C-alpha cells in the first residue's frame, strides 16, 4: 500500500492475477506485446501471432481436435461452445438436439446462455425465465458426507449416474450439450 503495509489479495480478481499485481516481468511482457500488436480483428483475417498461438494450442489437444476459436472471456467461451454444439447438431441433420444440461451450483459466466446452464440460484432468479430446454445435474458437494474424505468416498454412485437419469428423462437424442466444471470454482473452492 502507499503507507508501506502489505495486503494479501484473497480474491485475485476472480483468478486473473494469480501471479500477483504489477509484477515487473509481466508488465514488461504486456507492454512489449502491445507495441507489436495491440489488437487483431478475428473476423476473416488475423495476425501471424494469432495463427502461431492457435497452432500451439491445437498441438496440445488430442488428435483430431485442431480447431481453435479465441474469445475474450470465459463467459464468451461458454456462449460460443453452446452455439457450436447447437449448430453442429443442426448441420448433421439432428436439429432436435436442443436440450442443454449444466450442473446445480455451476458457474458458466454472465451471458444469457451461461446463466441458463449455470446452476447458481440467485443468478437465475435475478433474470427470470432464461433459455428453455435446460436441465441440471445434481451437485456433488454434500457437506455432511464429504467431510475430510480420504480416497474413494463411500457415497456418490447415484451422482455419477445422474446424467443417465436425465438422458432417460429427456431422451438422449434431444441433448445438444452437457457442460460441467470438473472442479467447482465460484461455488466450491
Regions found by a protein language model. Name each.
Residues 1-5:
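Residue-level recognition of short loop/turn positions
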Residues 6-95, 101:
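Glycine-rich loop-to-alpha-helix module at the N-terminal edge of alpha/beta enzyme cores
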Residues 13, 74, 106, 183-185:
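Short glycine-rich anion-binding loops that position phosphate/pyrophosphate groups of nucleotides
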Residues 36, 142-143, 184:
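Active-site/binding-pocket entry motifs
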Residues 44-45, 150, 154, 188:
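Alpha-helix capping and helix-loop boundary segments enriched in small/acidic/polar residues
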Residues 56-177:
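PLP-dependent aspartate aminotransferase-fold enzymes
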Residues 179-189:
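Conserved PLP phosphate-binding loop immediately N-terminal to the Schiff-base lysine helix
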Amino acid at each position: 500500500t502507499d503507507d508501506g503495509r502489505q495486503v494479501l489479495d484473497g480474491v485475485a480478481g476472480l483468478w486473473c492475477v494469480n501471479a500477483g499485481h504489477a509484477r515487473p516481468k509481466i508488465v514488461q511482457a504486456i507492454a512489449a506485446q502491445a507495441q507489436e500488436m495491440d489488437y487483431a480483428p478475428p473476423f476473416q483475417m488475423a495476425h501471424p501471432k494469432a495463427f502461431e498461438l492457435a497452432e500451439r494450442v491445437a498441438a496440445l489437444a488430442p488428435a483430431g481436435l485442431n480447431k481453435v476459436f479465441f474469445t475474450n472471456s470465459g463467459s464468451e467461451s461458454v456462449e460460443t461452445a453452446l452455439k457450436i454444439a447447437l449448430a453442429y447438431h443442426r448441420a448433421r441433420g439432428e436439429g432436435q438436439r436442443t436440450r442443454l444440461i449444466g450442473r446445480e451450483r455451476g458457474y458458466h459466466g454472465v451471458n444469457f446462455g451461461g446463466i441458463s446452464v449455470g446452476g447458481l440460484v440467485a443468478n437465475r432468479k435475478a433474470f427470470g425465465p432464461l433459455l428453455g430446454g435446460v436441465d441440471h445435474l445434481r451437485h456433488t458437494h454434500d457437506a455432511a458426507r464429504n467431510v475430510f474424505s480420504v480416497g474413494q468416498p463411500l457415497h456418490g454412485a447415484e451422482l455419477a449416474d445422474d446424467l443417465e437419469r436425465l438422458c432417460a428423462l429427456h431422451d438422449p437424442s434431444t441433448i445438444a450439450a452437457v457442460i460441467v466444471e470438473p472442479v467447482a470454482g465460484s461455488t466450491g473452492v
